[in-house]
Amino acid sequence: MVLEMKVIAFVGYPLSGKSTAAEVARELGLPVVVMGDVVREEAARRGLELTDENLGKVARELREKEGMDAIAKRCIPKIRELLKEHGVVVVDGIRGVAEVERFKKAFGDDFVLIAIECPLEVRFERVKMRKRSDDVSSIEELKERDRREESWGLKEAMEMADFTVENTGSYEDFVEKIRQILLKLAKNVEIEIRTKIHPTESEDKVLKAIRNIFPDAEIEISEEGEVYGRAYSLDRFRELLRKQRILDTARSEILKGRNGKEVTIYLNKQTATVSRINFCDENAVLSPIKVTFRLNNIPFSRFLDYIAPETKDGRPVKEIDKL
């Protein structure tokens, strides 16, 4: 089965939120190629200090010598390599039309461009917080940087975007906007975890039970003891199923818990505290761990075979190494 590949790129003016968007992608487990790193690496190779002036000079020279799509061309081999392993790659830092056209030529309909819009004044306020060595020191410098990038076709590149995200509200609102759009575009499994801490239970043990199965879980606890968590890595869950040799049971539970693009299973909380998986009913004593897998751009059959493939004589008939 050939799965859809996806290259998701961010374009925007300096300090509009591209780096934040890239960090959201990393938190979702998506690999990120930072186009600006090509310029920073070239400047470092030349022994130059990483100032805005030096980086601008290096970027300009690369484009004059190798074409306006020079930086994009240098990124493509790395993107292709990451696509082989992950299926989805996020690109941070498109600066002009030529780069968009180069990526479209290389990846066709698998290339998606997201524009981030943010006013000049808001962007300058972020300079003071980011404190990066190559940042501008005044709003006039930022305007000059805008003009420089516009000369490369930045404004036209933003007009070519498939999606536009406004970054004018709170940091949390922007992060959630980016997270939602990436989840829709990327091959991804979002894992929602719910349970309850009863008066007779230890909070530490309940949290340990969850993280024994999903180590990357981000967990919140309400005053009433309701536990909500979100995770993205399936590695430990898969590992334990194979270690315990319960793939047939897991496959059955996944099939039973399927509802469209979601799969819900219930895990025994007590056995999870010792890093063991034991499936149970929804109404189990002391509230089980309810796990819901939301499939984004992943066929259910692929997810099923990746987590719990069919077996023969207790061994997987065919293992799938990646989604």
From Swiss-Prot:
Which stretches does the entry tag as region UPF0201?
A: 186-323
Record-listed ATP binding positions: 12-19
Q: Does the keyword Repressor apply?
A: no
Q: Where is this region: UPF0200?
A: 1-185
The UniProt keywords, alphabetically, are:
ATP-binding, Nucleotide-binding
Which Pfam families does the protein's record reference? AAA_17, RNA_binding
Going by the entry's taxonomy, the superkingdom of the source organism is recorded as Archaea
Keyword Transferase, does the record have it?
no
**One Gene Ontology MF term:** ATP binding
Q: Which family does it belong to?
A: In the N-terminal section; belongs to the UPF0200 family.
Name of the protein this chain belongs to? UPF0200/UPF0201 protein AF_1395
Organism, per UniProt? Archaeoglobus fulgidus (strain ATCC 49558 / DSM 4304 / JCM 9628 / NBRC 100126 / VC-16)
* Species lineage: Archaea, Methanobacteriati, Methanobacteriota, Archaeoglobi, Archaeoglobales
